[in-house]
Design a protein with these regions (language model features):
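Short, active-site-adjacent cap segments at secondary-structure transitions
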Residues: 58, 103-106, 132-133, 183-184
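Generic beta-structure capping elements
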Residues: 60-62, 101, 147, 179-180
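HTH-adjacent hinge/linker in prokaryotic transcriptional regulators
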Residues: 2-7, 16-22, 28-30, 35-100, ...
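Conserved phosphate- and dinucleotide-binding cores of soluble alpha/beta proteins
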Residues: 2-13, 17-26, 31-36, 45-46, ...
Length: 261
């Protein structure tokens, strides 16, 4: 039986494949009562993740538009664990770039705790995410740079040609990116054209590239590819990929870090 925090993510993966799921189907898949499923359906509709209709949960047509709030509720515990592990890769003296996704945001929260505890003497952080900036409390050791550009209120981030022009002179020891899908054929991909382009730009200025993604993204592809497998240094996730993808990652010399849960 899936844990409570995993059920929403599981149903979202079903909707992504089939477009709909009934109460009875979800009850059998999740191993919970029909009443529990109906409550879950209601919560998902209230969050804008899906639409209820006559005992069936359907994909929300507007759900193709990314929402930071809605995405934060899917695989939330897994994202927290991934974020905590990823934050441990940051070292004193680093110049890092933080992407705008919800999993990287969890990393930002964990990194903020490390900064507050006095672990760093010098740290430079560049990000296109407004929520990342808000999560990082001012500290004398930390220089924080928010890049400008076209603001997306749903994503709470900046992107576009001006953002890429701003990024161009920088050099990063490490960049930490999210993704909406990763598979052998398409590599790492995003559902947003501007973010995909920005990620490619950032990677070109980075010594090491870390991708943070929960297990629902493994084996899938999104709209725009931004990197082949061999362009990534480390992937941090919560579960083992399927054998074919794991083999492809190993062949591409991508280091796989599992946070377990």
């Amino acid at each position: 039986m899936l844990r409570k925090n995993e059920r929403t993510g599981y149903l979202m993966s079903i909707l992504k494949r089939t477009g709909h799921v009934t109460v009875s189907e979800a009850s059998e898949m999740l191993g919970v009562s029909g009443a529990t499923v109906r409550r879950l359906f209601a919560q998902m509709e209230e969050s804008g993740l899906a639409i209820r209709s006559h005992g069936t949960l359907r994909s929300n047509p507007s759900g193709s538009v990314y929402s930071f709030e809605a995405s934060s509720q899917v695989y939330s515990k897994e994202k927290q664990n991934i974020g905590r592990m990823a934050a441990m890769f940051v070292e004193d003296g680093d110049i890092i770039y933080l992407d705008c996704g919800t999993t990287v945001f969890q990393m930002t929260l964990a990194l903020s705790q490390r900064i507050a505890s006095g672990e760093f003497q010098s740290l430079n952080i560049v990000t296109n995410s407004l929520v990342n900036v808000q999560a990082l409390n001012p500290d004398p050791c930390c220089q924080l740079i928010l890049v400008g550009g076209i603001y997306n209120s749903e994503r709470r981030d900046f992107s576009g040609p001006l953002t890429e022009k701003f990024i161009a002179p920088f050099h990063f020891n490490k960049c930490f990116l999210g993704c909406d899908g990763v598979n052998q054929r398409d590599g790492f991909s995003s559902k947003d054209v501007n973010i995909s382009s920005l990620n490619s730009c950032v990677m070109g200025r980075s010594d090491a590239v870390y991708v943070l993604c929960d297990s629902s993204k493994l084996g899938h592809s999104s709209m725009v590819s931004y990197a082949p497998l061999d362009r990534i240094t480390v992937i941090v996730t919560n579960a083992e990929p399927e054998a074919d993808l794991r083999s492809a990652l190993q062949s591409a010399n991508v280091h796989l870090n599992l946070c377990g849960g």
